[in-house]
A protein has these predicted regions:
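Alpha-helical scaffold segments that flank or form the walls of functional sites
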Residues: 81-147, 170-182, 432-436, 440
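Active-site gating loops and adjacent loop-to-helix segments of metal-dependent hydrolytic enzymes
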Residues: 79-111, 118, 145-166, 224-252, ...
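Active-site microenvironment of metallo-dependent hydrolases
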Residues: 1-32, 36-41, 346-441
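Divalent metal-coordination and catalytic microenvironments
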Residues: 17, 34, 40, 61, ...
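Catalytic core of soluble alpha/beta enzymes
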Residues: 223-272, 284-297, 309-320
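His/Asp/Glu-enriched, well-ordered alpha-helical/loop segment
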Residues: 245-252, 294-379
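Metal-coordinating catalytic core of metallo-dependent amide/deamination hydrolases
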Residues: 137-259
Length: 441
């Protein structure tokens, strides 16, 4: 556990060569410091020389910034990592992924979620938004590692007897009442799979339950052109307009992918205050397309990044998504100014927190949770580095391998590049065994 590694008692002061608060302005504090109080929240951020007396520094050098936030993941798919390569989305799901996932037990999900959570923490990802089944096991898996979790249990009509999802929605409502506890690192939402799996009316009913609970409504939206065409053929309108018609956009909404959204769709999402989770690697690997991120941002839609599942990515390194989001925004428009490095970094920090309706993560500021990471800058990829280019270097050279330390709510869960909470070798061995059993079943 963390304490066994000699983690210092709170309060603590972390001092770094640079602090990047990620407030949206690209501000960098040279010789910065972050104070963490006894409750695991940030009490002060600024130049170390200006903060006044405080605890002796426990970390010095490098760069401190907020922990990254993965806004769309199916992390327990670590057990089916890389299956079905080369198949389009529909066949990939039906032929390769779902048959294996349907054999996964809650114990499988618990181990697989813990494995993915470790992978993310080592990459500096402190929060993930999970759309998955066996939600109790997902919570238990993350509890072992010390990460922050937004769990949005899935609703899939194809798994419900006769397509009746009402009992499942009742389960999720009860789960929300029992487990939604942001102060204990767990937030709960509702996740209808998609409007091509569920009817518009069902999506509206699920959204109403989410809105009544003040919870996030998390749905796959316009991931492929085939999906868009199918929904129009079946229901007479694109998915976003159907969701608006049934009131599904009237509360907190997170739409995953958004690759084929048109101008009307984007304006509806913007008016509703909805967010889009952009998953560029998964969309490219599955041949789904490239989301119009520049148009989304231009129309006022909040955009963040996610990895999607490790079966379609195939890792959980969010730095890759940040970099690819910026590259695709520029390359697809032939405009090197289409997305600045500051905006790209925001997609995994401040904007990601907004997407998940988490008010106290994603920035380093007084009162926020002390979810933060340290990067080693004493490496070739960051040499030379200058104040005026540092954000650009974070976006285009940043990677999991440069993350040395990670704190969640003030607890140091990664220390000197090692997980401080679980036995990683045992975890990997058990997941290897369980993955082999799934394939052989």
């Amino acid at each position: 556990m963390i304490a066994s590694r000699g983690a210092p008692e709170l309060p603590v002061r972390l001092v770094a060569d640079y602090v990047v608060p990620c407030e949206g302005q690209g501000r960098i504090i040279p010789g910065g410091a972050v104070d963490i109080d006894t409750k695991g929240r940030i009490s002060a951020v600024g130049a170390a020389s200006e903060l006044g007396p405080g605890p002796a520094p426990t970390v010095t050098g490098g760069l401190l910034m907020p922990g990254l936030i993965n806004t769309h993941a199916h992390t327990p798919m670590t057990l089916v990592r890389s299956v079905g390569d080369g198949l389009p989305l529909d066949r990939w799901l039906k032929e390769a992924v779902w048959p294996l996932e349907m054999r996964m037990t809650p114990d499988d999900v618990r181990w697989a979620m813990a494995l993915g959570s470790v992978e993310m923490l080592l990459a500096g990802v402190t929060t993930s938004c999970e759309m998955y089944l066996h939600e109790e096991a997902v919570v238990e898996g993350v509890a072992q590692t010390g990460a922050r979790l937004v769990i949005t249990p899935g609703v899939i009509a194809g798994l419900a007897p006769g397509g009746n999802v009402e009992p499942r929605v009742d389960e999720i409502a009860a789960f929300h009442a029992a487990h939604h506890a942001p102060d204990r690192r767990v937030s709960v939402g509702f996740a209808p799979h998609s409007i091509y799996d569920l009817s518009p009316a069902q999506c509206g009913e699920i959204a109403a339950r989410a809105q009544a609970a003040g919870a996030l409504f998390h749905i796959h939206l316009e991931e492929t052109l085939a999906e868009r065409e199918q929904v129009i053929a079946t229901w007479g309108a694109p998915a976003t307009r159907l969701l608006a018609d049934v009131g599904a956009l009237d509360g907190p909404v997170l739409a995953a992918h958004g690759v084929w959204l048109d101008g009307v769709d984007r304006r509806l999402l913007a008016k509703a205050g909805a967010s889009v989770a952009h998953c560029p690697q998964s969309n490219l690997k599955l041949g789904s397309g490239i989301a119009p991120v520049g148009d989304l941002l231009g129309d006022g839609v909040n955009v963040a990044v996610g990895t999607d599942g490790p079966a379609s990515n195939d890792d959980l390194d969010l730095w890759e998504e940040v970099r690819l989001a910026a590259l695709l925004a520029r390359g697809s428009t032939h405009d090197p100014e289409a997305m600045s490095a500051t905006v790209a970094l925001d997609l995994a920090t401040r904007r990601a927190a907004t997407a998940l309706h988490l008010d106290d993560v994603g920035e380093l500021r007084a009162g926020a949770w002390a979810d933060l990471i340290r990067l080693d800058l004493d490496v070739p990829a960051f040499t030379p580095h200058r104040l005026e280019t540092l954000i650009t270097q974070l976006v285009f050279a940043g990677a999991a391998r440069y993350v040395t330390d990670v704190w969640v709510a003030g607890k140091r869960v990664v220390a000197d590049r090692a997980i401080a909470t679980v036995d990683v070798a045992k975890l990997m061995a058990e997941c290897d065994r369980r993955a082999a059993s799934l394939r052989e079943a």
